[in-house]
Amino acid sequence: MIGNPVIQVPSSLMPSSSMIACPRVSPNGVPYLPPKPRTRHLVVRAASNSDAAHGQPSSDGGKNPLTVVLDVPRNIWRQTLKPLSDFGFGKRSIWEGGVGLFIVSGATLLALSWAWLRGFQMRSKFRKYQTVFELSHASGICTGTPVRIRGVTVGTIIRVNPSLKNIEAVAEIEDDKIIIPRNSLVEVNQSGLLMETMIDIMPRNPIPEPSVGPLHPECGKEGLIVCDRQTIKGVQGVSLDELVGIFTRIGREVEAIGVANTYSLAERAASVIEEARPLLKKIQAMAEDAQPLLSEFRDSGLLKEVECLTRSLTQASDDLRKVNSSIMTPENTELIQKSIYTLVYTLKNVESISSDILGFTGDEATRKNLKLLIKSLSRLL
């Protein structure tokens, strides 16, 4: 048999006791017909052995591998639902139970997360400590102002206590491992485009090495760091308000000086101009007198003579340069050096002879004898 013919058999043709139409009577005595029977179609497939043998491999071979992979969880789900359906758990009840389980698990996870966050906050709260900065001017310090150590934010201002004497800014440091040395420089600075106020802490040398933290009871005895709720003094750093005040004072002083001295300066300038007028007249007269002299000097041949003299000096310098180059040849230079060496040697000999003569004539007895000899010779002559 070729193919898989389908034979539809109406269920109405099948023998059934319900197919016998019997008139029925209602309780009030009115007869009525029985309900129309529902027709059911049964599908019967006929297949040969050969088709059954070859049909399965062909259907499996034509499936997409992705479809096969996606069918695996579906088949697992179906296999899981079968035993549950035997105990009265339908598909709807399973979905409702899954939704309820999801809601319960989500609520449990949310509660655990909230408990963990609260525990973390409580643990971090026990590790924080407070310090008080004593300042002469607030300079915009308010709740939330950052506190920095070497440019790193380590805490914030939680409260500001103003008074007529000073300002006390209470800061909360985030971790007790962050210490503030006693010798630190605390400044209130304003920086940035919006001139944000911040408290900068700059530790100075020598950097302390405490053995206990700021929350330890023995912290105050060491005196190396700022302990919990202790006070440290601060100074005013870069302040926009102070800069504006300085420029305002300078402007007022300049304005006062300018208004006071403008009139006196104008009077002095006028007096100087009046005193300079005779001098200007004299300069003008001298210029008029010098103009004829300049014209005569220009018309005379003095300029030409000066030019000739300059040319003569130039030629003389050229001649001297040539003579120098002709005389100071390497041979002449060597001869001059030898002559200088000979002269030096001769002078040394003369010096030795003169020293000998000086040593001979330097004796008193020799001088007397020479005088007597000269006198005797003069008598003989």
Swiss-Prot record:
Subcellular location: Plastid, Chloroplast inner membrane
Primary subcellular site in the record, as a coarse category: plastid
UniProt protein name: Protein TRIGALACTOSYLDIACYLGLYCEROL 2, chloroplastic
Phenotype upon changing residue 237 to R: In tgd2-2; accumulation of trigalactosyldiacylglycerol
TM spans (from-to): 97-117
Entry GO MF terms: lipid transporter activity; phospholipid binding
Binding partners and assembly: Homomultimer. Substrate-binding subunit of the TGD complex, a lipid translocator at the inner chloroplast envelope membrane made of TGD1, TGD2 and TGD3. Interacts with TGD1 and TGD3 with an overall subunit stoichiometry of 2 TGD1, 2 TGD3 and 8 to 12 TGD2. Interacts with TGD5.
Gene Ontology BP annotations: intracellular lipid transport; lipid transport
Topology relative to the membrane: Single-pass membrane protein
Keywords from the UniProt entry: Chloroplast, Lipid transport, Membrane, Plastid, Plastid inner membrane, Transit peptide, Transmembrane, Transmembrane helix, Transport
Description of its domains: Amino acids 201-225 are sufficient for specific binding of phosphatidic acid.
Record note on what altering residue 98 to D does: In tgd2-3; accumulation of trigalactosyldiacylglycerol
Chloroplast intermembrane side of membrane: 118-381
Record's function text: Component of a phosphatidic acid/lipid transport complex in the chloroplast envelope. Specifically binds phosphatidic acid (PA). Involved in lipid transfer from the endoplasmic reticulum (ER) to plastids, and necessary for thylakoids formation.
Transit peptide extent on chain: 1-45
GO cellular component: chloroplast; chloroplast envelope; chloroplast inner membrane; cytosol; plastid
Parts of the chain on the Stromal side: 46-96
